[in-house]
Amino acid sequence: MRTHLRASLWVLCLASMAFSILAAVNTSPKPTLASAFSGKAGTPAVKANKTTGELLPMVINTWNFTAANVLAWRILKQSKGGLRQTRNAVVEGCSKCEKLQCDRTVGYGGSPDELGETTLDAMVMDGATMDVGAVAGLRRIKDAIKVARHVLEHTQHTMLVGDAASAFANAMGFESESLVTPESKDMWLQWTAENCQPNFWKNVHPDPKVSCGPYKPRPTPLTRWKEDRARNEYEIGRKNHDTIGMIAIDVENNIHAGTSTNGARHKIPGRVGDSPIPGAGAYADNEVGAAVATGDGDVMMRFLPSLLAVEAMRAGKPPAEAAQGGLRRILKHHKDFMGALIAVDRLGNYGAACYGLEEFPFMVSSPAGADRPTRLETVKCIAGQDKVNIVAL
């Protein structure tokens, strides 16, 4: 009898505990998007309700490329939501910069390589599907960002490069034409007249510091690598490493990010920078937000700063801290690089960080500036060791 009584009491105890647990689960508040992003709710509620607040829709891009931003904003405002409109906004905005040859570092007629040729890199990323279309080393085709879109929409690939990318563009209806202009030719001739200085070679002979080559490898003891690297360092600056990176978000939180550039001036032919690399030049995820980068692509692409920024926001960091963290990872290894990063969460909050420049300008269009929906923002940069200046808006 006592054995049966004890068993019955034990069953009742277990049932009571189970009921209590279920009640707690059913009555616990679900994490909201705000608490997820502030890191207060454990697992991020990445599929929270949509917002139609004052921050959206929005377009944001690197540098003071105003015309590109204005066009993208106009396209986005005309939309009723949907993936196509954010894509249209980014592609047409970047295309505008290509046509205007923004700072001679986007589009045709700028940044000639060692042979005097201009080649183009571009990328489009869809934050809903995580699909990417990109081109690198594109030759004789002016519309790099539009070709990247065709890679996204008409192939199962992520990136096409070089002459094969140009052949693909021809098949898609794009015409071949020279990307060299009198200005870019003069730029190249002046460079060659000055013994091809500066350049991107190291550990070769003849000495790349005083000669145009052709070069051959020079065996170098490992202990001398840092010395040679410092001696042959190419001075990176805005006028030879600009990229337009653009993010568009509509009121339904659909996100696209895109980039376009003609790369590093006087680059070794075949060089590809960070702009067309997913996670480096740009990254977008509808569940979190997006980021775009600009600067020394050869260094930045090794660290995937745009991906780092998006993942930091996924973990709860605000955009400004996420951008800062993306650059700090680079600074652990490269104290002398130049770069900037913009991060935006899916609700339209944004921040920027920069290093190695006096300041970094970027364009923003959103309802948040009712009297000035399209506006230029700037962030002061600090060139000191392991210091990154940030702006949170």
Swiss-Prot record:
<feature type="disulfide bond">
    <location>
        <begin position="97"/>
        <end position="102"/>
    </location>
</feature>
<feature type="binding site">
    <location>
        <begin position="294"/>
        <end position="297"/>
    </location>
    <ligand>
        <name>substrate</name>
    </ligand>
</feature>
<feature type="active site" description="Nucleophile">
    <location>
        <position position="243"/>
    </location>
</feature>
<feature type="signal peptide">
    <location>
        <begin position="1"/>
        <end position="23"/>
    </location>
</feature>
<keyword id="KW-0068">Autocatalytic cleavage</keyword>
<keyword id="KW-0732">Signal</keyword>
<dbReference type="GO" id="GO:0008233">
    <property type="term" value="F:peptidase activity"/>
</dbReference>
<comment type="subunit">
    <text>Heterotetramer of two alpha and two beta chains arranged as a dimer of alpha/beta heterodimers.</text>
</comment>
<dbReference type="GO" id="GO:0006517">
    <property type="term" value="P:protein deglycosylation"/>
</dbReference>
<feature type="binding site">
    <location>
        <begin position="271"/>
        <end position="274"/>
    </location>
    <ligand>
        <name>substrate</name>
    </ligand>
</feature>
<dbReference type="Pfam" id="PF01112">
    <property type="entry name" value="Asparaginase_2"/>
</dbReference>
<comment type="function">
    <text>Cleaves the GlcNAc-Asn bond which joins oligosaccharides to the peptide of asparagine-linked glycoproteins.</text>
</comment>
<dbReference type="InterPro" id="IPR000246">
    <property type="entry name" value="Peptidase_T2"/>
</dbReference>
<dbReference type="GO" id="GO:0006508">
    <property type="term" value="P:proteolysis"/>
</dbReference>
<dbReference type="GO" id="GO:0005764">
    <property type="term" value="C:lysosome"/>
</dbReference>
<feature type="disulfide bond">
    <location>
        <begin position="354"/>
        <end position="381"/>
    </location>
</feature>
<feature type="disulfide bond">
    <location>
        <begin position="196"/>
        <end position="212"/>
    </location>
</feature>
<comment type="similarity">
    <text>Belongs to the Ntn-hydrolase family.</text>
</comment>
<keyword id="KW-1015">Disulfide bond</keyword>
<protein>
    <recommendedName>
        <fullName>Putative N(4)-(beta-N-acetylglucosaminyl)-L-asparaginase GD10667</fullName>
        <ecNumber>3.5.1.26</ecNumber>
    </recommendedName>
</protein>
<keyword id="KW-0645">Protease</keyword>
<keyword id="KW-0378">Hydrolase</keyword>
<dbReference type="InterPro" id="IPR029055">
    <property type="entry name" value="Ntn_hydrolases_N"/>
</dbReference>
<dbReference type="GO" id="GO:0003948">
    <property type="term" value="F:N4-(beta-N-acetylglucosaminyl)-L-asparaginase activity"/>
</dbReference>
